[in-house]
């Protein structure tokens, strides 16, 4: 069964290479005309639109402080002090801090985890 599979694979590879050479040879001899797309003008962009700046940064994007990050619990984490800053996941305390400090992207509510609550 394996030998049959290898034999079929070799025959298929030879067929692909030989048919490709025929098409390339015919194209070089101008026997085939290049295909022209009649709808190419329809899909051409008239003017590239400029990307508008977002009001907040998503997870993993660059930031300057916690208020730049979109999520309520997202914090701006920096390497080496104030260099290479990006938004990462924070916690409930981060949300409370953002609620008091931020004027833009202020959290409306801070989600609490049900993991640490005592029942009873």
UniProtKB/Swiss-Prot annotation:
GO (cellular component) term, any one: extracellular region
Keyword vocabulary terms for this entry: Disulfide bond, Knottin, Secreted, Signal, Toxin
Compartments it resides in: Secreted
Propeptide segment residues: 17-54
Modification(s) after translation: Contains 6 disulfide bonds.
Tissue: Expressed by the venom gland.
Signal peptide start and end residues: 1-16
Every Agouti domain range: 56-95
Recorded superkingdom: Eukaryota
Disulfide bonds, paired cysteine numbers: 56-70, 63-76, 69-87, 78-85
Molecular function GO terms recorded: toxin activity
Notes concerning its domains: The presence of a 'disulfide through disulfide kOR' structurally defines this protein as a knottin.
Assigned protein family: Belongs to the neurotoxin 05 (agouti) family.
Name listed for the protein in its UniProt record: U13-lycotoxin-Ls1b
């Amino acid at each position: 069964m394996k030998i049959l599979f290898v034999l079929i694979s070799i025959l298929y590879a030879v067929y692909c290479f030989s048919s490709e050479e025929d098409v390339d040879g015919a194209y070089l001899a101008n026997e085939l005309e290049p295909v022209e797309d009649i709808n190419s003008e329809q899909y051409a962009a008239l003017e590239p639109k400029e990307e508008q700046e977002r009001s907040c940064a998503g997870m993993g994007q660059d930031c300057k402080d916690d208020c730049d990050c979109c999520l309520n619990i997202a914090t701006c984490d920096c390497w080496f002090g104030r260099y290479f800053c990006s938004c990462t996941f924070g916690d409930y305390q981060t949300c409370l801090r953002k609620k008091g400090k931020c004027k833009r992207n202020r959290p409306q509510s801070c989600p609490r985890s049900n993991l640490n609550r005592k029942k009873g």
